[in-house]
């Protein structure tokens, strides 16, 4: 047996040398994270699932790597009991060719776990070929499934780690084997956004699924999407992973959990922010203000808007320490009329010592570009994957030094990747658990439902004017008004007289061809309001509060700040370029070249948060409380890592 292990080790060593030549600029951890990120784009699963997968893959690679470097830290899974599941480990006799064995163990751990997870996914055919091709490309046998790691079998060790983590995943009942389905029946019937108003809603404080299939059948399939994306739409009334509060976290503990009950059902809620504002309560005014702000900002999504704004770091800085608490602070933090928030602009680039140059752009291009750049919906890396990709790009920057938390010696590429992937993916996993546990319990309404419901009620500003209703939309000159005599929206038979109208992005009815058409902003009946999104994915299939984008992004930004030892991107500036009429997919645009700029990781995260308001997906309450949860998650993760790593 020992002889066979020696032969296998020599064989793998030769292939390790070949693979190192092929992937000379990338570590084993990097090549496997790369292939997983590309698999996300081919998959129809949600951000919660991908955050968990990235974390489990990162933990598998970390535990495999640590076998060869026991002085570097403690195992996360191996030899420990996690949430009642025992990860037995009998020790490992490391081969003499340590580097090649390490490469093999990491590769088998990552590949086998991906294979086990994707075997039940609808995207199996689309993704598995890439996993298998990579294994063969680096000279490893994808069909070698032994988990016997005795006598220094590096491949068996990797397989063992992967299979134990997969078994652990089954034990926590995430739903790996049945599509992650969990019962959470909506209290409201579906809203068809192609039909005016929202008369069918029963509870305006609660989530309402959307039904866009009929509209797609009328309008035609979105040519920018793939055929398999259509299957996602057919299940749009299913709340995505409402059971995620039951999933085992990375760094959070029972001290972070609140046990809540609603409708006879018990919920585990992590980092509970408390309830959002509800209509029919003392927080009526806050409810109306939050959703009305979304409608107000929607009017900015027009390239013909003459407003120019400076989006350089000298004009827009991070919001750390500035987040509002009271309703009055919310109103001061957000610019209801013009968009944006208060922040702490950067006086100068701390790396170069020079001031940041202004970056004037059309507001209507900026808002549309960030709404699409950060959307991270179908056929993208998803929000967790977007931040993992950003971490990789930071690491690739020639100006970046791989010093853990900015201190000590420069780490080799593999150690940096192993550590940083676990740190970031762990925090993203906890962000997903926190955000979705909150979403499931509070089950909060989305703007499209609230805005249309209030418009059906009428106006709440003046009891002497037509259509007065205490729970209607407020009248705001130039933003929300009544359709009066001689208004073209009134209709030939004046059927719409005194209905509410909003100055807003006009919606997908004005876009027949995304390559040539721009809906623009204008006066529309409020009952027809749409968010600035694809008509086929108008709003995500789960509750709004809190924003997943805000939670993911702030958690990621704070972790990246900690592990790099600096809040700043390498060189003190990161830019993302978009060419004229060569980026937007919801409609034509941008109308001019535009460059997004961020000095700090937190600025990028804050922009993500605002993109969801301009995109019509979240009101401020979803955003701000999500940011706060993200901050807490990051802090918990960083403290945990300090004990895990040596």
Can you say where each PLM-predicted feature lies in the sequence?
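Bacterial Sec-dependent N-terminal signal peptides
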Residues: 1-21
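Acidic/polar surface patches and capping/hinge elements
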Residues: 20-646
């Amino acid at each position: 047996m020992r002889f066979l292990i020696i032969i296998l080790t020599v064989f793998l060593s030769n292939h390790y040398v070949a693979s190192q030549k092929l992937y000379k600029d990338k570590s084993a951890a990097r090549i496997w994270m790369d292939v997983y990120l590309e698999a996300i784009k081919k998959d129809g699963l949600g951000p919660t699932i991908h955050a968990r997968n990235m974390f489990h893959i990162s933990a598998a690679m970390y535990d495999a790597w640590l076998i060869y470097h026991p002085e570097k830290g403690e195992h996360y899974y191996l030899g420990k009991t996690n949430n009642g599941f025992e990860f037995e480990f009998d020790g490992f006799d490391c081969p003499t060719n340590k580097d090649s064995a390490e490469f093999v163990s990491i590769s088998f751990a990552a590949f086998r776990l991906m294979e086990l997870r994707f075997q039940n996914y609808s995207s199996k055919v689309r993704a598995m070929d890439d996993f298998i091709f990579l294994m063969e490309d680096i000279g490893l046998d994808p069909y070698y499934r032994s988990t016997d790691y005795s006598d220094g079998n590096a491949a068996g060790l990797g397989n063992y780690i992967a299979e134990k983590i997969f078994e652990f995943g089954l034990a926590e009942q995430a739903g790996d084997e049945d599509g992650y389905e969990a019962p959470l029946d909506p209290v409201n019937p579906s809203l068809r956004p192609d039909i005016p108003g929202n008369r069918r809603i029963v509870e305006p404080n609660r989530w309402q699924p959307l039904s866009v299939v009929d509209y797609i059948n009328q309008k035609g399939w979105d040519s920018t999407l793939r055929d398999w994306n259509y299957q996602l739409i057919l299940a749009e009334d299913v709340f995505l992973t409402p059971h995620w509060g039951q999933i085992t976290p990375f760094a959070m503990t029972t001290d972070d959990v609140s046990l809540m009950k609603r409708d006879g059902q018990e919920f585990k809620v992590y980092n509970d922010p408390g309830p959002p504002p509800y209509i029919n309560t003392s927080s009526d005014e806050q409810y109306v203000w939050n959703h009305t702000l979304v409608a107000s900002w929607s009017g900015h999504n027009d390239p013909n808007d003459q407003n120019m704004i400076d989006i350089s770091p000298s004009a827009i800085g991070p919001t750390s320490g500035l987040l509002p608490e009271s309703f009055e602070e919310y109103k001061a933090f957000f610019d209801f009329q013009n968009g944006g928030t208060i922040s702490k602009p950067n006086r100068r680039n701390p790396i170069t010592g020079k001031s940041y140059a202004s970056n004037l752009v059309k507001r209507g291009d900026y808002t549309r570009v960030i709404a699409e750049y950060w959307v991270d919906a179908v056929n993208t890396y998803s929000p967790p994957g977007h931040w993992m990709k950003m971490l990789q790009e930071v690491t690739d920057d020639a100006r970046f030094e791989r010093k853990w938390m900015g201190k000590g010696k420069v780490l080799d590429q593999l150690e940096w990747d192993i550590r940083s992937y676990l740190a970031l993916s762990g925090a993203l996993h906890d962000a997903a658990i926190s955000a979705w546990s909150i979403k499931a319990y509070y089950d909060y309404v989305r703007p499209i439902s609230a805005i249309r419901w209030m418009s059906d009620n009428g106006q709440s500003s003046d009891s002497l004017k037509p259509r007065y209703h205490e729970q209607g939309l407020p009248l705001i000159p130039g933003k929300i008004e009544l359709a009066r005599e001689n208004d073209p929206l009134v209709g030939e038979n004046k059927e719409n007289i005194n209905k509410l109208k909003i100055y807003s992005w006009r919606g997908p009815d004005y876009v027949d061809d995304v390559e040539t058409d721009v809906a623009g902003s204008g006066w529309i009946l409020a009952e027809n309001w749409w968010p600035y999104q694809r008509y086929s994915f108008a709003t995500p299939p789960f509750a709004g509060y809190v924003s997943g984008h805000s939670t993911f992004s702030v958690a990621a930004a704070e972790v990246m700040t900690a592990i790099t030892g600096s809040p700043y991107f390498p060189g003190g500036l990161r830019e993302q370029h978009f060419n004229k009429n060569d980026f937007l997919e919801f409609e034509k645009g941008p109308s001019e070249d535009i460059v997004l700029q961020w000095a700090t990781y937190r600025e990028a995260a804050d922009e993500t948060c605002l993109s969801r308001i301009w995109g019509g997906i979240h009101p401020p309450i979803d955003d701000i409380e999500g940011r706060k949860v993200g901050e807490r998650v990051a802090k918990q993760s960083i403290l945990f890592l300090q004990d895990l790593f040596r």
